[in-house]
């Protein structure tokens, strides 16, 4: 506590600002005795040309590991002249310790005494290590920032321990390697530099370990020691020739028991060792055989004396090389384009083929072809459109045996009458005028002529867009309503393999006429004209198909065509009469009927969402 009070009282007594800063920086200089940092602080604090002399002082006195001389010289330069500082520079470390109390007494400053006492304690602790410290600080001063970290006391202790350990390791290098088979490469390099000394020591002190150490030295420096082996091995050829012959058979037995290497390589081990002692065979032949022994030894952990540790760096490199190569091979095998994709496609192709047609023998052959194509990169062809075509064609023939003729005749009629939209609509309008009341229905065909003359295709696309907003299958048949009946028998079948929508287009052609009429008839606003609108849409087309009474739902909407041709009253009765057998036919048509009904419900307005049956019965109710 006295020291702290002295430190507090002293600045009030003597020039507080300058001296406090100097002492503070000098403490840092003491803690970092061998570095350039205290000199930099000193230059900043002392500024008036005194920094040059002080730098020299720091360098001269830190050789002893004491920064007290610098502090004392700085304290004396303030009350005294520079000559006193020069005298202190010439003084040596044993005198410095005796001068410290004199300096504190001459300055008569409690602050300086407190700091000096702290510095003296550190200095005395360093004087205990004076001899060890004198050797190193000269080199530490020149290292720059490294000296800052090395100047600390704990770092010095660590280095002293490290130096002791290094000395012990240099004195006994042969003891470090047997400790572990995976010794660091530095120890191995040290042994490669000093193999001859190890031979002499091992031969004199440890005769049992002679062959292993000798072989390691020969393997490492077979090219370097061949001229030297004649000089060094001359005093001890007896030990070399006698002991390996006695100890090689147990080594071979250990290799046979532990490593289980192939016989020819094991038999070459004693020959290689006996010839490595003579230095006749190069190192490469030994390195080819011994890495496998090293692997076995690392696994089984036998006596380290039988191992050639210098071969570990090269063996480790080879292992890393092999590991990289094997990793690349495994990566290619796991993610190789050809094999894995072929396997996946095989699985996918077999599953697809089995799902499409499980029983046909032709599909089995097509699976093989598909696999070959997939392996070559045709993964997209695994869908096998040919198989799909066959299946859909079979379904068509099974589902529609009677509708083939019906579908062919509409094609012919379409080829003659519906070459263009104008001819179709003109013929429709002509029959409608002759058969139906002219007062109300003439307006509809006239508007159809105008639209057919001007915007036939544009209106169809717009109506299909409206249907696409409401319906589901209309989007697939945009702008092809007139051409689809042509492509029913020829073009629809190849499309079925890809999408399967053309089959539904077969049955949904009449449905598309309904939304057309509904979109075109809002100005008429008469309720009974709406069910008659499909008659005006495609009368000549469906008369031929309805005479056959095919199972296609075309007959649902175009049976009223006969009613209009025969008369309004008879048409209502016939519509009511034909609607019932149509109901019985609906379950017979498999998929398209359900799709058509769904589309009719979705395409009609909210007021007409009841069903297609009500739309068919509406003319009968309203004419009666």
Curated annotation (Swiss-Prot):
Q: GO cellular component annotations, sorted alphabetically?
A: plasma membrane
Pfam families (alphabetical): AMER
What InterPro entries does the annotation carry?
AMER (IPR019003)
Where in the sequence is the signal peptide annotated?
Answer: none
Where is the segment annotated Disordered?
77-111, 126-177, 195-230, 342-369, 397-588
Which GO annotations describe the biological process of this protein?
ectoderm development; negative regulation of canonical Wnt signaling pathway; regulation of canonical Wnt signaling pathway; Wnt signaling pathway
Q: Which stretches does UniProt call biased (Low complexity)?
A: 102-111, 352-363
Q: Where in the cell is it found?
A: Cell membrane
Q: Write the record's keywords in alphabetical order, separated by commas.
A: Cell membrane, Lipid-binding, Membrane, Wnt signaling pathway
Q: Which cysteines are joined by disulfide bonds?
A: none
**Superkingdom classification of source:** Eukaryota
What membrane topology was assigned to this protein in its record?
Answer: Peripheral membrane protein
Which ranges are annotated Basic and acidic residues under compositional bias?
155-168, 195-204, 422-435, 450-469
User: Which GO molecular function annotations are given, in alphabetical order?
Assistant: beta-catenin binding; phosphatidylinositol-4,5-bisphosphate binding
Name the protein family.
Belongs to the Amer family.
Q: What does this protein do?
A: Negative regulator of the canonical Wnt signaling pathway involved in neuroectodermal patterning. Acts by specifically binding phosphatidylinositol 4,5-bisphosphate (PtdIns(4,5)P2), translocating to the cell membrane and interacting with key regulators of the canonical Wnt signaling pathway, such as components of the beta-catenin destruction complex.
PANTHER family in the cross-refs: APC MEMBRANE RECRUITMENT PROTEIN 2, APC MEMBRANE RECRUITMENT PROTEIN 2-RELATED
- Its protein name is APC membrane recruitment protein 2
Q: Which organism is it from?
A: Xenopus laevis
